[in-house]
């Protein structure tokens, strides 16, 4: 990293701002990020862990430009201790998140068939069956029920496990590992133990599926390894983040339901116009802050100009999809939830070649959860005052920890 960075206009670079990991009780926007957005389109930040500082892009057009620009890469991030949110950082070979082209496309091809629109459409009846069984359970027992524990957690686990090809007997163990990996509360040692457990299990599973013709992800990876298209280490590194991905659906929908349960006008709108829920879900996806801070950095592979500022080769850059989704130049009155907002080109699932692999699957699960809970629980409401709902702490993915409801 360069010792001094100057703008192309000769002005001094923006100051480096500390960005602590905040535990926010509720869906409110991160106040530090809001301040950084006001400061300018390109700022510099220092996160709780790692070394040095990084650039932060918050404007919609800049976020799209950077995430589409091959002059910014991810592969080098794995070799450096860049300033970051997570206390532990040991990426594995094969992870799509850190692959640059052409490796990214080669790896993604190995599993793409499991995440197509067609594959997701075929899965939908089975997913609905799983969800109906969970709702049947809480209806049989009667209210109150914690929707996070009883529905929002087990449903994505079961659906992702169907897609991945996880045997039913292993599903709870796999979920326990994923929970520990994405938490920031257990420390590096606990996360590393969970990673060893999960990736050891994945290695055994991929080996066992060698030569398989199945349509699940582990069978696809076993077959791809057998054909020499990906290495075993790459297959394991590719599968891990896909297995963990169900956590995002749990907590995104948890935030959506919290908003509907605490803002009567939103719930009324969703119930009165079920045919327009697709547009409404897009707006909720745009508005919610699905994560703490920012995700994964990129490295400038050569000098790049952004907003009149020279980002030097070797300097790290973060983009904020949360900030981009609140850009007033793209989303008028961006802090207001407008369930009729159209067009709504939100970036909730990312952008560029790192666009979420499971976006179609995640969207399908989100639609089923919201539709089914609203239709089968017509009197759905919180069982406790809103301020008593516990929110997740020391974690990268935001959302209510519990959602006690009655109906």
Curated annotation (Swiss-Prot):
Q: Where does flaviolin 2 bind?
A: 290-291
What is catalysed by this protein? 2 flaviolin + 2 reduced [2Fe-2S]-[ferredoxin] + O2 + H(+) = 3,3'-biflaviolin + 2 oxidized [2Fe-2S]-[ferredoxin] + 2 H2O; 2 flaviolin + 2 reduced [2Fe-2S]-[ferredoxin] + O2 + H(+) = 3,8'-biflaviolin + 2 oxidized [2Fe-2S]-[ferredoxin] + 2 H2O
Q: Name one GO biological process term.
A: pigment metabolic process
Compositional bias of type Polar residues: which residue ranges? 1-11
Per UniProt, which keywords does this protein have? Heme, Iron, Metal-binding, Monooxygenase, Oxidoreductase
Q: Which cofactor does it need?
A: heme
Region (Disordered), start-end ranges: 1-20
Question: What Enzyme Commission number(s) does the record list for this chain?
Answer: 1.14.19.69
Quick one: which pathway?
Pigment biosynthesis
| Name this polypeptide is given | Biflaviolin synthase CYP158A1
Q: Which organism is it from?
A: Streptomyces coelicolor (strain ATCC BAA-471 / A3(2) / M145)
Q: Which gene encodes it?
A: cyp158a1
């Amino acid at each position: 990293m360069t010792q001094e960075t100057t703008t192309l206009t000769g002005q001094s670079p923006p100051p480096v701002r500390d960005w602590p990991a905040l535990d926010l009780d509720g869906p409110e926007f991160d106040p530090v990020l809001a301040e950084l957005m006001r400061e300018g389109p390109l700022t510099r930040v220092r996160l709780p862990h790692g070394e040095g500082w990084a650039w932060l892009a918050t404007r919609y057009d800049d976020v799209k430009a950077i995430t589409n620009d091959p002059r910014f890469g991810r592969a080098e991030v794995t070799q450096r201790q860049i300033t970051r949110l997570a206390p532990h950082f040991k990426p594995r070979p094969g992870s799509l998140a850190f692959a640059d082209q052409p490796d990214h496309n080669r790896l993604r091809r190995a599993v793409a068939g499991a995440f197509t629109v067609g594959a997701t459409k075929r899965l939908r009846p089975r997913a609905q069956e799983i969800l109906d069984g969970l709702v049947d359970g809480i209806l049989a027992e009667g209210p109150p029920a914690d929707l996070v524990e009883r529905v929002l957690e087990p449903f994505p686990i079961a659906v992702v496990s169907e897609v991945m090809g996880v045997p039913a007997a292993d599903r709870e163990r796999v979920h326990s590992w994923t929970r520990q990996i994405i938490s920031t509360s257990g420390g590096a040692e606990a996360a590393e133990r969970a990673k060893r457990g999960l990736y050891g299990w994945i290695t055994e599973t991929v080996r066992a599926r060698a030569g398989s013709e199945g349509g699940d992800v582990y069978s696809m990876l076993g077959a791809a390894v057998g054909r020499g298209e990906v290495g075993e280490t790459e297959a394991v590194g590719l599968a891990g983040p896909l297995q963990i991905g169900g956590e995002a659906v749990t907590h995104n929908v948890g935030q959506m339901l919290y908003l509907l349960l605490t803002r009567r006008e939103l719930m009324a709108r969703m119930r009165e116009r079920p045919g327009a829920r697709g547009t409404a879900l897009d707006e909720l996806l745009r508005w919610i802050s699905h994560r703490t801070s920012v995700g994964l950095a990129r490295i400038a592979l050569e000098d790049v100009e952004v907003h009149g500022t020279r980002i030097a080769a070797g300097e790290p850059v973060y983009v904020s999809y949360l900030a981009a989704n609140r850009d007033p130049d793209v989303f008028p009155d961006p802090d207001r939830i407008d369930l009729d907002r159209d067009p709504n080109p939100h970036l909730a699932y990312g952008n560029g070649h790192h666009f979420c692999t499971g976006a179609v699957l995640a969207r399908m699960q989100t639609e089923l959860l919201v539709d089914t809970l609203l239709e089968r629980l017509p009197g759905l409401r919180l069982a406790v005052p809103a301020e008593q709902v516990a929110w997740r702490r020391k974690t990268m993915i935001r959302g209510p920890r519990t959602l006690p409801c009655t109906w």
